Amino acid sequence: MFFGILKAIILGIVEGITEFLPISSTGHLIIVDQFVKISSNKAFTTTFEYVIQLGAIIAVVLLYWKRLWPFGGGKTEKQRFNIWATWVKVVVGVIPSVIIGFLLNDWMDKHLMNWLVVSIALIVYGIAFIFIENYQKNRRPRVRTINHLTLADVLKIGFFQVLSIVPGTSRSGATILGGISIGVSREAAAEFSFFLSIPTMLGVSVLKIGSYLHSHGMFSGEQIVILLVGMFVSFVVAYVVIKWLLRFIQTHDFKAFGWYRIILGVLVIALGAIGIID
């Protein structure tokens, strides 16, 4: 039990750090999992990875509660309207990934969940971040806040999110890159990426958990403890990381993350080539 909890803490930290940074949580977990296996049961390991995502989602909801909850006192009609408008944009933004994900998710997991695909995605999107940031360097953002996003804008960002079905792409990376490439400010692109994560990650996590319970029955007591520990650690770390990222991008661009992705991608290739990861 002790070592199971320790592994859950380590993986929760990795998930909390990488989920909302554009560096691919999958790319990191595929490496860490080789050294810190939460379980010999592959189905439980996969389910654990989706459960700890719930902790990261809770961090977003808690941080942005006032901007996401339209009910209760103290809000003007304009504020309520903006909140409902934000939710409409989120729903429109997730439509492409819901459709494509439903059609291709199982095929992607079967054929693309390997270190080579992950490493290529890390490198390709790392280069894309550097290119887009250089291209947009001297351009003023066309959209500075989520309130100014049009439905056409969010649909385009939603199609970028579809790219994250490929392992190693990074859901946050794809949506932030998509936002910046169409002229959205870094802050607005990052925040909308956080908001899109709520229905996207919640839906996938619930489906994966339901699938596990249907196939394997209820979790054991030890498994429940491990899941809760991992989810709580992911929540705490993600909360801190989101606040840090929002401060960071006020004075920095995303090129550093692009270079980091390239280095990580090369590392994954090296580890895969010598057989350390499979």
Swiss-Prot record:
It comes from the Bacteria. GO terms for cellular component: plasma membrane. The keyword Transmembrane applies. Keywords: Antibiotic resistance, Cell membrane, Cell shape, Cell wall biogenesis/degradation, Hydrolase, Membrane, Peptidoglycan synthesis, Transmembrane, Transmembrane helix. Its EC number is 3.6.1.27. The keyword Iron does not apply. HAMAP family: Undec_diphosphatase (MF_01006). Belongs to the UppP family. This is Undecaprenyl-diphosphatase 1. It comes from Oenococcus oeni (strain ATCC BAA-331 / PSU-1). The gene is uppP1.
